[in-house]
């Protein structure tokens, strides 16, 4: 007879196959129809506020896997905090100004770009940015990220631009903004100044030359310098020595050369000089004020002192050109040296460079070297591969060039020290982030905030045509900000000066009305760095300072730092209470993603092939505080992990199809094994909550997966299967298990909800109506950890039983391999327990209970047994005694004792006698 209809087999419409690629868009549509973001916010009205402020991605191209990682991490935090009872708004934003967009637009326009007005270029840039905001918005939504997508913040929005100008105005009024001629990074290809955050370092092959400068007063004496930038020699005005180093006067043939003693041997070897003699040694300070002759310009080169001169390379005599170097410039200020920078915006030498006028600086290198060789000033040459700054956008090498620019003085009003103090008050995850940004802020130069481009917020500066004064006045900025709020910044390039200036405004220096607007724009890091003012302070649903900023580790010198300096400079405090940093993404071998290696992974491809849920699981499984690895192989591993999670959720649902929360059994009446499972669940809730609080999502993932695989699938669910399927449908034994399964399902689904946002919603829809308080799981309350369920003696006892079970499972596996048994229920095991502790525990339970624990038909105990030699017991496996029950498949010598049910064991007979009305027999 087929007894299938008398068993409580799992039943659920929750499918085994996830079909994520089809189901996820359907879920997105449901969320859209219910206006998910508004619904969640309405249900958290009046709750404590938690503000994660979105660092704006750049509106240029499709999202890549790094952008996806960032947005998914933010979504984990927002969804967890919401379920924790917080009102956690999420206003996504986009960085929409700047060189990358202008560069793309110019590339598309080709030669035509040069003929167009700035106003026209700006309109095309806006259109380009708008296009990619729309594209990226859909791509982020596809990842399951919840946010106010209909009302994002955009840095080209007039109100946002006006807020940025207000930040600038405050800094101008406090005296933190100045204009000067100073060497800065300059991209000759993009024709603009660059900030440190816009420079990338790549390996670059450079000249390495040694040049002698003749002493003007002692014609046979020479200062020997070393440089890797021959093109900067036309701007040389000095040679720097360290006042504290010893310098040797060395005889080489008939000449006396001056070099640092600590570099003498190394330098002579590099120059190929084998024969030389040290004549005398002096401190560097003794040479101060001496004068050398420039090797090819009709100009003096003064000997100056500088503490930064080091003994790591070169000669200890450092070629100094204040127009082409930050340290050189500082030395030039101290010695009042001229700042010469004979290079135009395109990197072409001007007539000030003499015979090299008209040459591109890097093209001039070999010519200058050859001229030095011919004149006899070149005493050594070679090539060196070293780390050199390149433009972040066009990837070409940049130069250091002195130009007139606007700067934020990071030391005025103790801005640097205040920023360092705020860094100390901020919580950094991981903790090394604090040291990293501290070092960067300590060592950073003043911030060059002007750019010579079109697409950005104009700096509302004017130049007086009568006295030449550059004017950047807080009153003028405030007036212009008022216009911008209504009209946007395009008006700067379209309106006349009289329309842009406050009525009756005159030059503060000479009183002239003859003022001409300047066309520099603000560094985009000022745009995005002002978001604390333009978004966090302005929006009613947010609060300043924000609780969390989370971005990639490159933002220590980017958005974290620009936001910090601007906020401290205008508000006196950091814009964030804590900062989370994530690493970069590499391939499986730890190599950087690149087109040339063909190892880039496209998030859209993963979404379309496997579903966004798999990408989200990959993010959760990765320790994002380090560099993270991804490949299709790694994605396949996450597909397997997803299946394990989904199958467990499905199994739980299947065994609860006839259960309602009102059927629950009180804790005191639960079976002991069920109490153990509840305890394990609550330990998981405790640990997972702690990991979410610390933003350690990979530990959340590991803990949940271990719980599912080890505690549930391999142990608890395996053991209770018999009780669930075979005991009476409404029996206390089965209801005890179901009570626990229900609590596990609800709590587990909630703990997974921030990560598996689509799957948890699908599970939620399959829960009994009484267990669903909202239209979405995203508003449910986080599972509550209950200390009273933690019983250390119970845990200790069961740990020993589990250890014994491991020995039995190994013995059963051997018996199965030897074809002694097929299913474990075919077995009877006899145990010789070695451990007195375990023996005492086992004796407290019935043999039937222990047999159920091992999933065998019978258990016996003996003083001496021959069999598998386990760690805790010797285990002998035999064929079970008696006949197989056709309902539960256990063997019993009493099977068939009831003539009415001749192929059933007494337990199954009793179940059907008592609960027969529950089944269709």
UniProtKB/Swiss-Prot annotation:
Keywords: Aminoacyl-tRNA synthetase, ATP-binding, Cytoplasm, Ligase, Metal-binding, Nucleotide-binding, Protein biosynthesis, Zinc. L-isoleucyl-5'-AMP binds at residue 551. It is an enzyme of class 6 (ligase). GO terms for molecular function: aminoacyl-tRNA deacylase activity; ATP binding; isoleucine-tRNA ligase activity; tRNA binding; zinc ion binding. InterPro entries: aa-tRNA-synth_I_CS, aa-tRNA-synth_Ia, Anticodon_Ile_BEm, Ile-tRNA-ligase, Ile-tRNA-ligase_type1, Ile-tRNA_ligase, M/V/L/I-tRNA-synth_anticd-bd, Rossmann-like_a/b/a_fold. It catalyses: tRNA(Ile) + L-isoleucine + ATP = L-isoleucyl-tRNA(Ile) + AMP + diphosphate. ATP binds at residue 595. Its cofactor is Zn(2+). Binds 1 zinc ion per subunit. A motif ('KMSKS' region) lies at residues 592-596. It is found in: Cytoplasm. Its EC number is 6.1.1.5. GO terms for biological process: isoleucyl-tRNA aminoacylation. Zn(2+) binds at residues 885, 888, 905, 908. It holds the Pfam family tRNA-synt_1. GO terms for cellular component: cytosol. It comes from the Bacteria. NCBIfam families: ileS. Belongs to the class-I aminoacyl-tRNA synthetase family. IleS type 1 subfamily. IleRS has two distinct active sites: one for aminoacylation and one for editing. The misactivated valine is translocated from the active site to the editing site, which sterically excludes the correctly activated isoleucine. The single editing site contains two valyl binding pockets, one specific for each substrate (Val-AMP or Val-tRNA(Ile)). Monomer. Catalyzes the attachment of isoleucine to tRNA(Ile). As IleRS can inadvertently accommodate and process structurally similar amino acids such as valine, to avoid such errors it has two additional distinct tRNA(Ile)-dependent editing activities. One activity is designated as 'pretransfer' editing and involves the hydrolysis of activated Val-AMP. The other activity is designated 'posttransfer' editing and involves deacylation of mischarged Val-tRNA(Ile). PANTHER family: ISOLEUCINE--TRNA LIGASE, MITOCHONDRIAL, SOLEUCYL-TRNA SYNTHETASE. HAMAP family: Ile_tRNA_synth_type1. This is Isoleucine--tRNA ligase. It comes from Kosmotoga olearia (strain ATCC BAA-1733 / DSM 21960 / TBF 19.5.1).
């Amino acid at each position: 007879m087929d007894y299938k209809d008398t068993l409580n087999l799992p039943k659920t419409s929750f499918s085994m196959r996830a079909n994520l690629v089809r189901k996820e868009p359907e879920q997105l549509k449901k969320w859209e129809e219910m206006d998910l973001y508004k619904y969640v916010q309405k249900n958290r009205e009046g709750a404590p506020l938690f503000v994660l402020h979105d660092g704006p991605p750049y509106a240029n191209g499709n999202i890549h896997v790094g952008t996806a990682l960032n947005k998914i991490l933010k979504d984990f935090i927002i969804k967890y905090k919401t379920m924790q009872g917080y009102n956690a708004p999420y206003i996504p934003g986009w960085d929409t100004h700047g060189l990358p967009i202008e560069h793309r637009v110019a590339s598309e326009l080709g030669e035509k770009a040069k003929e167009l007005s700035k106003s026209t270029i700006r309109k095309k840039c806006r259109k380009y940015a708008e296009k990619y905001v729309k594209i990226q918005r859909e791509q982020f939504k596809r990842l399951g990220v919840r946010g106010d997508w209909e009302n994002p913040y955009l840095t080209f929005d007039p109100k946002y631009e006006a807020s940025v100008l207000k930040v600038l105005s405050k800094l101008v009024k406090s005296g933190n903004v100045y204009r000067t001629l100073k060497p800065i990074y300059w991209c000759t290809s993009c024709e603009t100044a660059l900030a440190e955050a816009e420079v990338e370092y790549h390996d670059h092959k450079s000249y390495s030359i040694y040049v002698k400068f003749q002493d003007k007063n002692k014609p046979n004496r020479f200062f020997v310098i070393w440089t890797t930038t021959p093109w900067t020699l036309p701007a040389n005005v000095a040679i720097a020595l360290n006042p504290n180093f010893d310098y040797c006067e060395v005889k080489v043939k008939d000449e006396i050369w001056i070099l640092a003693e600590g570099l003498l041997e190394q330098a002579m070897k590099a120059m190929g000089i084998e024969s030389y003699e040290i004549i005398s040694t002096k401190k560097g300070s003794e040479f101060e004020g001496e004068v050398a002759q420039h090797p090819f310009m009709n100009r003096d080169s003064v000997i100056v002192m500088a503490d930064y001169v080091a003994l790591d390379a070169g000669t200890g005599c450092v070629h100094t050109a204040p127009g082409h170097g930050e340290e050189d410039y500082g030395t030039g200020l101290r010695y009042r040296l001229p700042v010469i920078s004979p290079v135009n915006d395109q990197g072409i030498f001007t007539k000030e460079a003499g015979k090299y006028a008209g040459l591109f600086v890097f093209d001039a290198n070999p010519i200058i070297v050859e001229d030095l060789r011919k004149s006899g000033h070149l005493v050594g040459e070679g090539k060196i591969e070293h780390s050199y700054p390149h433009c972040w956008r066009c990837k070409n090498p940049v130069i250091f060039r002195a130009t007139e620019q606007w700067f934020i003085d990071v030391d005025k009003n103790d801005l640097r020290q205040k920023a360092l103090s705020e860094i100390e008050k901020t919580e950094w995850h991981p903790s090394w982030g604090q040291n990293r940004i501290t070092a960067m802020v300590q060592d950073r130069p003043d911030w060059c905030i002007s750019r010579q481009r079109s697409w950005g917020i104009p700096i509302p500066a004017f130049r007086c045509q009568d006295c030449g004064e550059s004017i950047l006045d807080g009153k003028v900025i405030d007036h212009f900000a008022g216009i911008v709020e209504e009209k946007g910044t395009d008006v700067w390039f379209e309106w006349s000066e009289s329309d842009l200036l406050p009525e009756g405004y005159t030059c503060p220096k000479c009183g002239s009305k003859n003022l001409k607007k300047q066309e520099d724009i603000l560094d985009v890091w000022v745009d995005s760095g002002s978001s604390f003012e333009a978004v966090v302070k302005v929006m009613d649903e947010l609060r300043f300072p924000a609780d969390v900023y989370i971005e990639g580790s490159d933002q220590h010198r980017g958005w974290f730092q620009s936001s910090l300096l601007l906020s401290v400079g205008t508000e006196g405090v950091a814009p964030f209470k804590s900062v989370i940093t994530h690493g970069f993404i590499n391939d499986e071998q730890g190599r950087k993603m690149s087109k040339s290696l063909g190892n880039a992974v496209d998030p859209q491809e993963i979404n379309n092939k496997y579903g966004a849920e798999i990408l989200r699981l990959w993010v959760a499984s990765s320790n994002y505080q380090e560099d993270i690895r991804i490949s299709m192989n790694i994605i396949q591993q996450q597909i397997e992990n997803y299946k394990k999670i989904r199958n467990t959720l499905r199994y739980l649902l299947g065994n609860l199809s006839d259960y309602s929360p009102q059927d629950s059994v009180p804790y005191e009446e639960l079976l002991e094994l069920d109490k153990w499972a509840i305890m394990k669940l609550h330990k998981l809730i405790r640990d997972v909550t702690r990991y979410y609080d610390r933003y350690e999502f990979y530990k959340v993932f590991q803990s949940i997966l271990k719980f599912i695989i080890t505690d549930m699938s391999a142990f608890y669910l395996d053991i209770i299967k018999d009780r669930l399927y075979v005991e009476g449908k409404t029996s206390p034994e089965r209801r005890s298990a179901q009570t626990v399964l229900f609590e596990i399902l609800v709590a587990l689904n909630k703990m997974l909800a921030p990560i598996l946002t689509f799957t948890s919603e699908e599970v939620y829809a399959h829960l009994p109506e009484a267990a669903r308080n909202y239209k979405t799981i995203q508003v449910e309350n986080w599972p509550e950890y209950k200390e009273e369920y933690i019983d250390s003696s119970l845990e200790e006892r069961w740990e020993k039983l589990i250890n014994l079970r491991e020995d039995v499972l190994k013995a059963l596996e051997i018996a199965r391999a030897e074809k002694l048994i097929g299913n474990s229920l075919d077995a009877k095991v006899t145990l010789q327990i070695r451990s007195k502790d375990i023996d005492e525990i086992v004796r407290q339970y019935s043999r039937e209970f222990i047999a159920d624990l091992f999933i065998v038909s019978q258990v016996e105990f003996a003083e001496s047994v021959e069999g598998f030699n386990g760690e805790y017991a010797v285990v002998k496996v035999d064929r079970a005694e008696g006949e197989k029950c056709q309902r539960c498949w256990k063997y019993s010598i009493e099977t068939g004792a009831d003539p009415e049910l001749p192929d059933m064991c007494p337990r199954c007979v009793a179940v059907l006698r008592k609960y027969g009305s529950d089944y269709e027999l």
